[in-house]
Amino acid sequence: MIIRPGSIVSALQKLSCLAAVLGLAGIAPAIAAEPKPDAAVKMKYIDASVTLEKQIRTNAPLAENLLAEGKHWIEENRGNAAKEFKASPELFRDGRAWTFERSYAQTSNVGGRYVSIVRTDYVYTGGAHPNTLIDTILWNDETRKQISIRPFFKETADNGPTLKALRDAAIAAVKAEKKERGIEDSGDIDWYQGILPALLKVGAISLAPSTVAGKSAGLAFHYSPYAVGPYAEGSYTVFVPWETFKAHLSPQGLAIFGGDRPPDTKPDAE
């Protein structure tokens, strides 16, 4: 499960108090400092931040692109929060500002060209609990642009053979992960009806790392909480080996896939 970024005030206060106690006791705290946000806005009605993983910061064009996207996201949410604050100020009493935290993490670099990024948004605007939204970005280091996985396949038409194969493989992988977690789906809800044979609806996709240098072992599908199960189940990241969809790969796709997933790869590292 992907861990949400933690800049909640109470959590930081607890860490600060613990560090102070350890310092007074002459013990060096072994708690790693929270990464400093690359962009942040804090006002009466909003507490928002964007954080780039250290590895991303070393890639200047990529970092610039993602940071611009993140700042736009902050500004959009700031505007919405400002309107709500003006219309219903009582919702923001006692320091109850809306919280928006976005983090970008690099999960693979295939052939020194294709960089997979997982974008995680933590959002709380009141209600029973916060929401975590997960999406992915594929970056081409040569063209310095965000791209799609479409060129890796012979065709990617909605309801076409490629997307149907990917849809079926993704659902099977989620069911296998649920079985491993000891979770049984309720017969009252079809949690897989939202996974459709369309590139934008089959799931957030990233290129999984491989045991072969410069290759990808397959596709990782990332699902936010609520996407394929109740909120309590959390998020899912599942793996589909490249051999499963080999018949649908274009020459460009055949060139980047190969090998197996490293045995020590954790789901949230894909």
Identify the function of each model-found stretch:
Residues I2-L18:
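Bacterial N-terminal signal peptides that target proteins for export
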Residues I31-E270:
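Compositionally biased intrinsically disordered regions enriched in Thr/Gly
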Residues L22-G23:
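Repetitive helical segments and hydrophobic/amphipathic motifs
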Residues A19, A30-I31:
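Cleavable N-terminal signal peptides
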